[in-house]
């Protein structure tokens, strides 16, 4: 078993997330919303804590018991960079919600601190293109979380150009083969980002439902704001309102029970999917195929460990209760399922291919 990734190596990607990305995010959140002195002081306190020991959740937190089961009793009080990177990163976002009063009494309860960023991305989207084939929609869904780099859904295969060439693994044929095996069944989609990524996810769901390639789509989103742009139920509704005729069809599909939105607490857990609870395991086990979207879900699917890139995908996902596909733009160091020649060619160009968002994969 490969070692769990921690963030204690200066200059490493995890270290940069903890010591550079998180402080920058606190500053952005502080500036994006007119929080009062108390909330600003709490944000400043969280910023000061990053170089020290992990603090506890706010007194009276309703989910304290849940986080204790997820490891807080073991990790609170220890330095941030000495605990598993996945755990520290997830817990940071939970603590950020405490700092802005998301769960507490007062005017900021339930106010998404990332809403200004999500709204700006959604407002910048071009109108959805009608009539795209499933393969084009699949690639649009894959590359959607590069929207911060200026990528947009484009019409037809020609518009995919550069994006397709960045694939380090492409088992899209295997994905369609699994989906078309037997009678149309349930497709589970574990969403990643809102806005530019969620919209093509929904357009793909609409196309598959309309073509009767699936009988229903179960869309898993986050129960509360998480990792800045991760999709919540509110983000689903916002996208449907921007999706034109497809949005109207999906709105009706939700009313009919053919599109089901679920926000399971484990979606925000700081743990790999190997530790999923039984009810979530039953959800995935009932599906013809589960599609895991994005970088974080990939890390949770295969395990946030120092795997050799040639480790077989099937080996590290063998625990999953049904067929599972990963659609992911590479934005962290974890990757498996590549052949030696591909790894050698990519490494020859430097290590940034793992983290720069310039490459992607489709694995089944």
Task: Describe each PLM feature range.
Residues 1-186, 363-364:
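Non-catalytic accessory regions outside enzyme or core folds
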Residues 6, 221-223, 229-364:
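C-terminal functional extensions of proteins
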Residues 16, 86, 169, 198-202, ...:
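Conserved structured core elements
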Residues 83-87, 190-199, 224-226, 295-300:
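Gly/Ser/Thr-rich loops at beta-strand to alpha-helix junctions
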Residues 178, 204-211, 279, 283:
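Catalytic-core regions built around general acid/base machinery
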Residues 186, 214-218, 323:
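Residues at the starts of beta-strands that form the adenosine-phosphate
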Residues 186-188, 288-289:
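Structural motif
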Residues 196-218:
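Histidine-anchored nucleotide/phosphate-binding helix
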């Amino acid at each position: 078993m490969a070692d769990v990734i921690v963030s204690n190596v200066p200059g490493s990607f995890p270290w940069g997330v903890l010591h550079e990305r998180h402080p920058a995010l606190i500053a952005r959140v502080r500036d994006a919303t007119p929080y009062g002195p108390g909330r600003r002081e709490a944000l400043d306190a969280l910023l000061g804590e990053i170089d020290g020991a992990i603090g506890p959740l706010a007194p009276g937190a309703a989910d304290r018991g849940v986080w204790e089961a997820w490891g807080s009793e073991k990790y609170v009080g220890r330095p941030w960079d000495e605990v598993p990177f996945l755990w520290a990163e997830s817990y940071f976002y939970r603590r950020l919600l405490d700092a802005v009063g998301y769960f507490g009494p007062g005017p900021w309860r339930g106010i998404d601190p990332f809403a200004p960023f999500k709204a700006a991305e959604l407002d910048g989207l071009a109108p959805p293109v009608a009539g795209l084939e499933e393969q084009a929609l699949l690639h649009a869904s894959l590359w959607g979380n590069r929207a911060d780099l200026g990528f947009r859904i484009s019409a037809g295969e020609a518009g995919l150009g550069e994006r397709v060439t960045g694939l380090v693994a492409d088992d899209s044929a295997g994905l369609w083969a699994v989906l078309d095996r037997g009678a149309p069944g349930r497709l589970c989609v574990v969403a990643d980002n809102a806005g530019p990524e969620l919209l093509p996810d929904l357009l793909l769901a609409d196309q598959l439902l309309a073509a009767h390639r699936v009988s229903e789509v179960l869309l898993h989103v986050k129960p509360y704001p998480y990792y800045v742009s991760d999709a919540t139920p509110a983000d689903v509704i916002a996208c449907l309102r921007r999706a034109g005729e497809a949005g109207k069809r999906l709105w009706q599909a939700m009313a009919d029970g053919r599109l089901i939105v679920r926000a399971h607490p484990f979606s925000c857990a700081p743990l790999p999917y190997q530790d999923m609870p039984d009810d979530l395991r039953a959800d995935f086990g009932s599906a013809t195929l589960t599609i895991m979207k994005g970088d974080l879900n990939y890390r949770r699917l295969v395990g946030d460990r120092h795997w050799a890139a040639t480790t077989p995908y099937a080996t590290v996902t063998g625990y999953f209760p049904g067929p599972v596909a990963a659609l992911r733009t590479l934005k962290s160091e974890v990757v498996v399922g590549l052949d030696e020649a591909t790894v050698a060619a990519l490494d020859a160009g430097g290590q940034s291919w793992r983290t720069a968002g310039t490459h992607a994969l489709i694995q089944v």
